[in-house]
Amino acid sequence: MRPTGCSLRGRSLKKERKVFKELLPPDEAMRRLEERVPPTPPEAEEVPIEEALGFYLAEDVKSPINLPPYPRSAADGYAVRARSTWGASEDEPVELRVVGEVRVGEAPGFELKEGEAAEVDTGSALPPGADAVVMIEYVKEVGDKILVYKSVVPGENVLWPATDVYSGQPLWKRGTRVDSRVIASLASVGIRKVRVWRPKVYLISTGSELVEPGKPLETGKIYDVNTYSLQARLREEGFVPIVHGVVPDDKEEIKKAILEGVEKADVVVTTGSTSAGPADFVYRAVGEVGEVLVHGLAFKPGKPVMLGVVKGKPVFGLAGHPDSAYFNLERLVIPYLRKMVKADERSQSSTKAVAATSFVGAKGRRTHVPVSLLTDGSRWFAFPASHSDHAMVSYSKADGYIVIPETRRAPVEPGEEVEVWLFKDPSYKGAIVGDTDVAVDAVVERLDYPPKMLPLGSYSGAYASKMSLRSVWISPEAVGKEVEVEVVAVGRGERVGVPHKSSFLYPFFSKFLEVEGISREELQKRFVRVTMPTPQALASAVASGEVDAAITTRNAAEALGLDWRPLSKAKLYIGWTEDHAELGREVLNEFLRRGG
């Protein structure tokens, strides 16, 4: 007699049992799949930015405006012409006449003259003529006048146009995963909708023994875990699971489910029924409606994994045990999906880094400083994410932040170890650090991956060169290939765009004044000075009318159709580490092609 519970199925199907003849390394298995079914992006969908959360940008995004779009107050107080306050002190305050006020959301309806002041709030637009803001705590109001007890310099407590981002500046590369910081930056520049990729994954759990969680569990049955764990993991990564549910161990039912899946989704994932036993039907089903490319991998867990193609869509047959299925999804399916959308790396919590420059905290306050990280292969090095404390877009692209305690009086010094709390995984495929020009923008636009950009000026480029940080560096002080960039003047007028002290353009500002016939004394008395971080920002500010004149590069001027006047030639050196040779040569050739 046959024991109760046994079946003759094993005997009748014994001839169908398959033996794994070739166990491939995972990399080789995926190479075969990707050669047969390249991981190309799905059709893009346009969605409101609030619905884009978690998905992947399907195209590069540029800023349509300068940010800030107009001069704004960074403090509550009074807008003034800075020179009107010079000489002010606690003992001898300067008296100014209050001629109006500008509230947040209002457009100034008057021009500020010397000896005058206008009350402003944090975020208010500055009236024409104003170039600084005296904080309210340094002012005493006396009727229609104020007494100023502390002098200010041009630009103090002012957010100038394009100091965060300039019109046309690349913000995010396609393939960037949309998170709350990306949405904040998009809203900051007025973008309402974006095109995203949302790859759909069809999930099929196979096994006559599987029961939906929540239902009574009979002897011989187990709960279906894979349907729930895998769809959750896919959602965590920004992919869209379509759940078919449980299919019994029946070849025809499995075939039907797979054929339905390739019609509804971009990728099909099955779990269970992939081994070599007589009741393992997935590879047989795929073989009948498509092609089995790989069956059996040389890693654990994952030996019975099957990779195939049906009607041009990839089919992943994963092991049925929940731990194995999850591991297989993580190691095989998710990397394939990330390639489809050119995804960013996943996040970490914190890491140690070396301060690449000094970081100064606010006295008596715990200070969080956004940073970008580069590596020499063994250590991370922390750079400031921006020159400005009010740069939302730059902040949103930071890798993380360091915390300077409120009790610390001394700055964080270069070379000091810091703890970086991460917004995301700081790993990168490519990075460009130091000085910049539109030649760099042109190269970035051609790349099919999002490089890490640190346009922080000459010091950062020289530091990356000195420390051999994995990157392409650009600086007049670095080691590398020499290129010449033509420095030019654009526009004329009393509102002057000044390069940041970290920029390679800054040493040429004296030449700009000489050619324009402006003395240092006149500059102090007559001109409004607006500091900008890059040649592109300076040119953009002139093109948009935010400043009247500026020093920039010929490339930046011509990119915006500006007339320019020659000033001088700047020498820059472009170098790179070996792993950045291809990107470095592309940047170098773009500078040479543009010829200054």
Which residues does each predicted region cover?
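Short helix-initiation/N-cap motifs at beta->coil->alpha
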Residues: 436, 448-461, 524-540
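Helix-rich terminal scaffold detector
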Residues: 2-27, 192-318, 322-328, 332
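Periplasmic-binding protein-like
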Residues: 480, 484, 561-589
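Flexible glycine/proline-rich
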Residues: 23, 27-30, 40, 45-50, ...
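A ligand-binding cleft/hinge motif common to bilobed small-molecule-binding domains
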Residues: 460-472, 540-565
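Short, glycine/charged-enriched hinge/interface segments at domain edges or termini
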Residues: 14, 20-26, 79-245, 259, ...
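N-terminal segment of the mature folded domain
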Residues: 438-492, 575
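Short loop->beta-strand "edge-of-pocket" segments that line small-molecule binding or catalytic clefts
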Residues: 432-434, 490-513
